[in-house]
Swiss-Prot record:
It is found in: Cell membrane. It catalyses: [protein]-peptidylproline (omega=180) = [protein]-peptidylproline (omega=0). Coiled coil: none annotated. GO terms for cellular component: plasma membrane. HAMAP family: Foldase_PrsA (MF_01145). SUPFAM superfamilies: FKBP-like, Triger factor/SurA peptide-binding domain-like. This is Foldase protein PrsA 1. Residues 1-21 form the signal peptide. Its EC number is 5.2.1.8. GO terms for biological process: protein folding. Plays a major role in protein secretion by helping the post-translocational extracellular folding of several secreted proteins. Gene3D superfamilies: 3.10.50.40.
Length: 294
């Protein structure tokens, strides 16, 4: 789960905020001496300082301009529940996370996304250009295995009438989808491994199965679940816009948006130990394609 590390930073940030300025009260006592709140704060600041102060500061800045609703957070949370299935709670637990702490980080990520969207050029010309190569989302099942021999074995079983969903549960090494018969979330161009995506979009009719597809993850067999014909620009504009925005939520564009928000906030760092915390966001060396359409 790519966002779990960021959630840990959220938890640490909250702890640092509570410890700041707390003084000499002991948090741990031993016969050899005590660990004070000040000592803990300084140690955590040294280890996590820059990341923590960045997230705390950006959260404060973004909350003043953008709103993330509980409904939006819950919808994002549900995606992870569905993706990880029965292993979701154990995955959170193994990373010392709770439902609440994970949702807090999802809220922060959504704030960053909204700031990035606000700085995008979503003009008609941009959308029409994007529409030329855009395709509607496609839904497929897949079976992922480590070697071609196993993939051929599955192919034979499919030809003999065995169900794709049953074979996915039995063979697929993709634990996030195997229990659900290999079903993947709908995806569009540029969202998957290029070879996998090309093979998926080449399927024409429901339940068609691809040949063996080699990707960076292993060997796949892909079954088409749903494929929608591409409509006119006027008909598809809302879908095109959503896909375009999603394609522009890159690290580069998010950083550019945060730079702009930080500059507008007139930040003043009081703690000299954290003077370089925002160096990556105040430099002018990097550029981005993200621009405001206003």
């Amino acid at each position: 789960m790519t966002k779990l590390k960021k959630v840990m930073i959220s938890v640490i940030a909250a702890t640092l905020l509570l410890l700041a300025g707390c003084g000499s009260s002991a948090v741990i006592k031993t016969d050899a001496g005590s660990v004070t709140q000040d000592e803990l704060y300084e140690a955590m600041k040294t280890t996590y300082g820059n990341e923590v102060v960045q997230q705390l500061t950006f959260k404060k800045i973004l909350e003043d301009k953008y709103t993330v609703t509980e409904k939006e957070v819950n919808a994002e949370y549900k995606k992870y529940e569905e993706q990880y299935g029965d292993s979701f709670e154990s995955t959170l637990s193994s990373n010392n996370l709770t439902k609440t702490s994970f949702k807090e980080n999802l809220e922060y990520n959504l704030l960053v996304q909204k700031a990035t969207e606000a700085n995008m050029d979503v003009s008609e010309s941009k959308l029409k250009a994007y529409y030329k190569t855009w395709e509607p989302d496609i839904t497929v099942r897949h079976i992922l295995v480590d070697d071609e021999a196993t993939a051929k074995e599955i192919q034979t079983k499919l030809k003999n009438g065995e169900k794709f969903t049953d074979l996915a549960k039995e063979y697929s090494t993709d634990t996030a989808t195997s229990t659900n018969g290999g079903l993947l979330d709908p995806f569009g161009p540029g969202e998957m491994d290029e070879t996998f995506e090309k093979a998926a979009y080449a399927l024409e009719n429901k339940d068609d199965v691809s040949g063996i597809v080699k990707s960076t993850y292993g060997y796949h067999l892909i079954q088409l679940v749903k494929k929608t014909e591409k409509g006119t620009y006027a008909k598809e504009k809302a879908n095109v816009k959503a896909a375009y925005i999603k394609s522009q939520l890159t690290s580069e564009n998010m950083t550019a948006a945060l730079k702009k928000e930080l500059k507008a906030a007139n930040i003043d760092i009081k703690d000299s130990d954290l003077k370089d915390a925002f160096a990556d966001y105040t430099s002018t060396s990097s550029t981005s394609s993200t621009t405001t359409s206003n």
